[in-house]
């Protein structure tokens, strides 16, 4: 799959399931710090493409779509994972936490 193509729906669903079930706290962290929604109380990954990860955040009891861009286009699951880890680490640094994922 090359840049400019979207991921297969099954792949997006698998990645979203893992992010939402295993890393829900990271979703909120990413949305608060990198997604411009510091008041988010919850966030679920809702999709992705080669350019960004998408979330549905809860802000003041309202569902808000949030798109957080990758540092570079991604073309496979390993790159998505690396970008998710980068996002979490960058978000932690923004909050003064230097511990890496």
Functional labels for PLM-detected ranges:
Residues 1-101:
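Binding-site signature for planar aromatic cofactors or substrates
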């Amino acid at each position: 799959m090359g840049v400019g193509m979207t991921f297969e729906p099954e792949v997006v669903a698998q990645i979203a399931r893992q992010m939402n079930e295993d890393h829900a706290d990271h979703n909120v962290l990413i949305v608060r710090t990198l997604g411009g929604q510091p008041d988010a109380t919850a966030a679920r990954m809702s999709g992705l493409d080669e350019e960004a990860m998408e979330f549905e955040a809860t802000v003041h009891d309202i569902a808000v779509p949030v798109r957080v861009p990758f540092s570079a286009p991604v073309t496979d699951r390993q790159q998505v994972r690396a970008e998710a880890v980068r996002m979490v680490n960058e978000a932690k640094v923004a909050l003064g936490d230097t511990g890496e994922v």
